[in-house]
A protein has these predicted regions:
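Membrane-interface helix-loop junctions in multi-pass transporters/channels
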Residues: 1-130
């Protein structure tokens, strides 16, 4: 059973992450062409990098409390990244007959987020062992 402090940490992190996602998504989407959902891709790549970085810190240090870990990972980064939006945007591209763009979106999100999580993890591992 989670403590009320952990639940509050997740909720407050989620609030900040959701607002940050909306802001960054709008900022990225405004600056780039609208043929591909770059805003969603951007927040997913960014969030995956920081999740990897945090996982390394969580594994190799004891600096973070359970509430801090929950705030940052499940709350903030969980709300910043968005699998459901990625899925619906890919579906809409397919329904619109944009098979190449849908395939590109799916590939960039799937491969890109794993790459960014791995990159973040190795940066975090390097930083904790320096």
């Amino acid at each position: 059973m989670m403590s009320w402090q952990t639940i509050l940490a997740i909720g407050s992190g989620g609030f900040i992450g959701a607002v940050l996602r909306a802001y960054l998504n709008g900022l990225i989407s405004h600056k780039l062409p609208h043929d591909l959902p770059y805003g969603t891709l951007g927040v997913n790549l960014l969030g995956s990098f920081f999740m990897g970085l945090l996982m390394a810190y969580f594994m190799y240090t004891s600096v973070f409390s359970i509430q801090a870990k929950s705030f940052l990972s499940t709350g903030l980064l969980g709300a910043l990244t968005t699998y459901s939006t990625f899925a619906i945007e890919s579906l809409l591209l397919l329904q619109g007959g944009h098979v190449f763009l849908a395939t590109a979106n799916i590939t960039l999100n799937a491969v890109g987020t794993v790459f960014m999580a791995g990159s973040g993890f190795y940066v975090g591992k390097f930083l904790t062992h320096s």
